């Protein structure tokens, strides 16, 4: 056999043996976590988690229901399992990413129609894809210094949503967006930015009186309203009765109590230039910090911080500091399917943060702030462009 043929045969054998790792297919096969492995990971996590009701049960007794998220949110990127006794576990589909991405000790996971949750999950996918460029499994953090802080909003039973009665004073939709069903005659959603902010305000039960009015004009690109559409909130005249602004609503409350929360939501939404519609949005963090101080009289310590300005360790230290001072954090990111705002109000001491999504408690639980492998962050552990342009508003106190 001549040298040329021998070389060809050797290359073929190496390829068949899976040693040509430049081929991403072979690399993914080496690190992929299949469905059985993912389910086993979820069961093991449940058994080791004393906080989850099923924790003391045998593997055979733990019943899991796989959640089909569809598209890139499933399969090779992540698996989500609801626990029959309450709670859920999110497992990454690749061993170059953290094994467990999120969990809850109660309720169930549901991202349908909830854009802030879907967007956050999408950011996980983008980070998992980045990790797939690596040739090393996820090693985790050598030393975890995160404090344990029980959910601050849960401690007061605060679980707001975006529909009735929270949106009874938001603008009424006037037009049909081409290609969509009609929402004409319905009140716009409060928006995740306003809902997150209002939940933090309810936690502090502040202010008793508004400080400064606010007005703005809806963007002419908004397809749900006739233009120009000017919105005004007489915040300076408001007397916020926190006894009537309840921690949560079931629909059986008095009209006074319903109007109290809807007035707060409308004031907050207008103060952050809400882009109203069936799914309302806002630029978020920069406007939230301004509104809290200028319109609602919060402490001048309120300010925005950006993920890209910190290492991973320093960023999480900023969040930990707020939680240790019993101050819920307004948190925001931007992903492929839009922005997402929510409240971080707790920590479990294992690098998971408690998230209140603002959907009446649905899908609330403990989540990692990112799914990145430290090896993907490089020197200094900065954001690396894969943290969804995350920002937070901290120092929120009366």
Curated annotation (Swiss-Prot):
Gene encoding the protein: speB
UniProt xrefs under InterPro entries: Papain-like_cys_pep_sf, Peptidase_C10, Spi_Prtas-inh, Streptopain_sf
Post-translational modifications: The mature protease is derived from the precursor sequence by cleavage, either in cis via an autocatalytic mechanism, or in trans by mature SpeB or host proteases (trypsin, plasmin or subtilisin). Maturation can involve a number of protein cleavage intermediates. Mature SpeB probably plays the most important role in protein maturation in physiological conditions.
EC number(s) given by UniProt: 3.4.22.10
Database matches in Pfam families: Inhibitor_I69, Peptidase_C10
Similarity comment: Belongs to the peptidase C10 family.
Organism: Streptococcus pyogenes serotype M1
SUPFAM superfamilies reported for this sequence: Cysteine proteinases
Region feature (C-terminal active site loop): 368-390
Reactions listed under catalytic activity: Preferential cleavage with hydrophobic residues at P2, P1 and P1'
Coiled coil: none
Alphabetic keyword roster: Autocatalytic cleavage, Host cytoplasm, Hydrolase, Methylation, Protease, Secreted, Signal, Thiol protease, Toxin, Virulence, Zymogen
Keyword Hydrolase: yes
GO annotations of cellular component type: cytosol; extracellular region; host cell cytosol; host extracellular space
Name the record gives this protein: Streptopain
Endpoints of the signal sequence: 1-27
Record carries keyword Plastid: no
Binding residues for a protein: 282, 339
GO biological process terms held by the UniProt record: protein maturation; proteolysis; symbiont-induced defense-related programmed cell death; symbiont-mediated evasion of host immune response; symbiont-mediated suppression of host autophagy
Record: active site: 192 (nucleophile), 340 (proton acceptor)
């Amino acid at each position: 056999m001549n040298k040329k043929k021998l070389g060809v045969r050797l290359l073929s054998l190496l390829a068949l043996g899976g040693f040509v790792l430049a081929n991403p297919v072979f690399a993914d096969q080496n690190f992929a976590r299949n469905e059985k492995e993912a389910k086993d990971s979820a069961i093991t996590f449940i058994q080791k988690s004393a906080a989850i009701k099923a924790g003391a049960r045998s593997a055979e007794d733990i019943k899991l229901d796989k959640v089909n998220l569809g598209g890139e949110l499933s399969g090779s990127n992540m698996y989500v399992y609801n626990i029959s006794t309450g709670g859920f576990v999110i497992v990454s589909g690749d061993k170059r990413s953290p094994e467990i991405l999120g969990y809850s000790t109660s309720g169930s996971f549901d991202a349908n129609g909830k854009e802030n949750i879907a967007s956050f999950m999408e950011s996980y996918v983008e980070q998992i894809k980045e990790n797939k460029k690596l040739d090393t499994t996820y090693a985790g953090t050598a030393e975890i210094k995160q404090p344990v802080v029980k959910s601050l909003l849960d401690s007061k039973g605060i679980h707001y949503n975006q529909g009735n009665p929270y949106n009874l004073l938001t603008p009424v939709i006037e037009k049909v967006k081409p290609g969509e069903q009609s929402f004409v005659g319905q009140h716009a959603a409060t928006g995740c930015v306003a809902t997150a902010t209002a939940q933090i305000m309810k936690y502090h039960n502040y202010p008793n009186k508004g400080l400064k009015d606010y007005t703005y004009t809806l963007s002419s690109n908004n397809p749900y309203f006739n233009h120009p559409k000017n919105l005004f909130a007489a915040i300076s005249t408001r007397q916020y009765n926190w006894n009537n602004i309840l921690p949560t609503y079931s629909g059986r409350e008095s009209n006074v109590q319903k109007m109290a929360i809807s007035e707060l939501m409308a004031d907050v939404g207008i103060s952050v230039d809400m882009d109203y519609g069936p799914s309302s949005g806002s630029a978020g963090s920069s406007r939230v910090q301004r509104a809290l101080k200028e319109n609602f009289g919060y402490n001048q310590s309120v300010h925005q911080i950006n993920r890209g300005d910190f290492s991973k360790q320093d960023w999480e230290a900023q969040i930990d500091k707020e939680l240790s001072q019993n101050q819920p954090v307004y948190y925001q990111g931007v992903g492929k399917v839009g922005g997402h705002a929510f409240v971080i109000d707790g920590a479990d001491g294992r690098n998971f943060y408690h998230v209140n999504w603002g959907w009446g408690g649905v899908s609330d639980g403990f989540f990692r702030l990112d799914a990145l492998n430290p090896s993907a962050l490089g020197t200094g552990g900065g954001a690396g462009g894969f943290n969804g342009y995350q920002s937070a508003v901290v120092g929120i106190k009366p």
